[in-house]
């Protein structure tokens, strides 16, 4: 009984951190491109 929710939470956590990482990368490249264009 204990393992099931734990596994689910781990999956959610991994998926969330992966999505966050992708988001940050996109924002970073966006800022870099806009900054280089501005200059």
Curated annotation (Swiss-Prot):
Species in which this protein is naturally found: Treponema pallidum (strain Nichols)
The organism's place on the tree of life at top rank: Bacteria
Protein name: Uncharacterized protein TP_0759
